A protein has these predicted regions:
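Transmembrane alpha-helix segments characteristic
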Residues: 8-13, 143, 195-197, 234, ...
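Membrane-interface alpha helices of multi-pass inner-membrane proteins
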Residues: 36, 139-140, 144, 150, ...
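Transmembrane-helix signature of polytopic, membrane-embedded enzymes
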Residues: 2-9, 88-98, 118-145, 163-164, ...
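Hydrophobic, aromatic-rich transmembrane alpha-helices
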Residues: 215-219, 293-316, 355-361, 367-375, ...
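Short acidic/glycine- and proline-prone juxtamembrane loop motifs at membrane-interface regions
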Residues: 151-161, 291, 344
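Membrane-lumen/periplasm interface segments of multi-pass, membrane-embedded glycan/lipid transferases
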Residues: 48-61, 245-309, 392-432
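Perimembrane helix-loop-helix junctions
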Residues: 175-179, 209-242, 303-313, 357
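Specific aromatic-rich, kink-prone transmembrane helix
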Residues: 142, 161-181, 189-197, 354-358
Length: 452
């Protein structure tokens, strides 16, 4: 009973901030919503009736289609179906301004937002096994409210979905072949890991690197379970050729091949030129502009954490070290490494699961530093996410030149608080108060008797 109460409180602690602010408008989320509206209102994936609100599209044989991988749309479909039915029952046109706002808000929260919150339960169990219950919870709050996972859980992007699926896959692998120690050699867990990784790739093609690294890890530990993992990945991976076929009639024709509004995508392999850039790497890791460690200093604890990880498992050490490094090198040579209007290095989202485990190990060793860094991460990333997760591309000093002036001017976007009549900074009061109460209750609900 105590475990169930804890799980419910943890879910609420995350879903509340994920749902509080109205999702901001942008090409990335609009193109996926266009597909959902087209499928449910017109029975087609062609977005001809909606395409003018996005630049993330291609034109093929006189029709417009989303250029994005299909996975996020599939994940979001159940939530959209529910809100579409409710809007219909209330005689609200889903394509009207009000209908669009309601459907986007609800769909975002109960697709990528809910997936992220559920994955936190899996990560908690994984971290608790190798640290302690309290360290695991501090790490959960830091990762899910103080990193890119929070930022992209409030919009219909692919990044939080991919990170969440990889986290569930890591938990499943730990119960299959074992992550830091020997596993249970559970076939169903290896199949689950495969399903999550296949869906990860179907959400974001570049996450194939992280998925491939995990496949090699499982293959190294147990060939039979690597086959189970591959079998589990087949069904979700079929979403990719199905989407290609529905658009162009060819299962091998990826929509990115026909993107014209972003000329950088024509360079190299879909924009990746395999020319590592040290300056860009710094921007991706340490700068105000897109720095992963600047906005999420809790992840710096992965540095001492890797030392402890080496002592626990050399194979896991190399997995969690090399995967982020290779991803960093590749993204540094990507034409759009900055991610356009964004907060943080969104193209590195798929490496977060590989950093949060060693960061939790570091937090377990340096508990006071862990709490301080977790609080700082939540403050910085939370500030940016609440104010404007789609920060202007041209602002290089986001904190000092963009977010702090927004706070000083009281410029706050629409939220549940503003719908209740609260204005400016006061509109955030329910978010902060209820979040603090939920986090406190979650902390008190931990069953420390199961601590490692």
């Amino acid at each position: 009973m105590r475990t169930r109460i804890f799980a419910i409180l943890l879910l609420c602690s995350l879903l509340w901030p994920y749902s509080y602010m109205q999702p901001p408008w942008g090409y990335n989320q609009a193109t996926r919503l266009d597909v959902l509206h087209a499928v449910f209102s017109e029975g087609t994936i062609a977005i001809d009736s909606f395409h003018e609100n996005t630049g993330d599209k291609i034109e093929w044989n006189g029709h417009f289609y989303s250029e994005k991988a299909p996975g996020v749309v599939v994940i979001a479909a159940p939530a959209f179906a529910a809100v579409y039915a409710v809007l219909g029952a209330l005689s609200i046109d889903s394509s009207s301004e009000l209908g669009w706002k309601i459907s986007e808000w609800f769909t975002t929260v109960f697709s990528v937002g809910l997936l992220a919150a559920l994955s936190a339960l899996f990560l908690f169990q994984l971290l608790k096994k190798y640290t302690s219950s309290r360290t695991a919870l501090v790490s959960i709050f830091a990762v899910y409210l103080g990193t890119l996972i929070y930022t992209y859980a409030v919009m219909l992007f692919s990044h939080t979905a991919t990170a969440s699926l990889i986290i569930i896959a890591l938990w499943a692998i730990d119960n299959g072949v074992g992550l830091l120690d020997s596993g249970k050699l559970s076939r169903r867990h290896s199949l689950l890991a495969g399903g999550c990784l296949g869906l990860t790739i179907a959400c974001e093609y570049t996450s194939a690197l992280s998925a491939g690294a995990l496949l090699l890890f499982v293959l190294f530990k147990n060939r039979k379970h690597a086959m189970y993992l591959l079998c589990g990945s087949v069904l979700p991976l079929l979403l990719i050729p199905l989407n290609n076929w529905l658009i162009s009639g060819s299962i091998l024709s990826i929509p990115y091949e026909y993107v014209t509004d972003f000329p950088g995508m024509q360079k190299g392999l879909f924009g990746i030129e395999f020319a590592p850039n040290i300056s860009v790497m710094w921007q991706l890791l340490g700068s105000q502009y897109r720095g992963l460690f600047f906005w999420s200093p809790f992840l710096l604890l992965c540095i001492p954490g890797f030392v402890f990880l080496w002592k626990k498992s050399t194979s896991a050490f190399w997995l969690m070290l090399i995967t982020p490094i290779v991803s960093l090198v590749l993204i540094s040579s990507y034409s759009y490494w900055h991610g356009g209007w964004a907060l943080g290095p969104r193209h590195l989202a798929s490496v977060l699961p590989f950093l949060c485990i060693p960061a939790a190990l570091g937090c377990h060793r340096f508990k006071k530093a862990g709490i301080v860094f977790a609080a700082l991460s939540i403050l910085l990333t939370g500030l940016g996410t609440v104010l404007q997760p789609l920060a202007p591309e041209g602002k290089t000093k986001l904190l000092t030149d963009f977010y702090i002036p927004m706070v000083q001017s009281g410029e706050i976007r629409e939220s549940l608080g503003s719908l209740l009549g609260l204005q400016s900074i006061l509109s955030l009061l329910p978010l902060f108060v209820i979040s603090a109460v939920l986090m406190r209750l979650t902390w008190k609900a931990i069953d420390t008797r199961t601590a490692a």
